[in-house]
Amino acid sequence: MYDENNIFAKIIRGEVPCKKLYEDEGVLFFNDINPVAKIHVLGVPKVPCIDFSDFVSNYDINIVAQFFKKTEEIISMLRIKNDGYRIISNSGINGGQEVPHFHIHILGLMQKTHQVLDV
């Protein structure tokens, strides 16, 4: 069951402030308050959906497509399209989801995490 008092629902309603990058009638993109990369943006659809499966299973394909199309536009706006980026969405407790509202993380300008081993 969807929790109307989750932090993203409050941000969408304007009850909690955020640093908005883009907003329209269906989506909101804003900076993460605890970034793990130089660019760390959260994207949320403005419909009451708990996770990815809830979003794609219970909402019109046009709403889902609009969200992902807008995600691509945000990636272009952030100028990370050519250099590489990550899109992450955790789902459920065992998937590491912390806020029970479907959202994505867009991470860019990350430091390399792999090491080259001398053999």
Give the ranges of each region predicted by the language model.
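HIT superfamily nucleotide-processing domains
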Residues: M1-V119
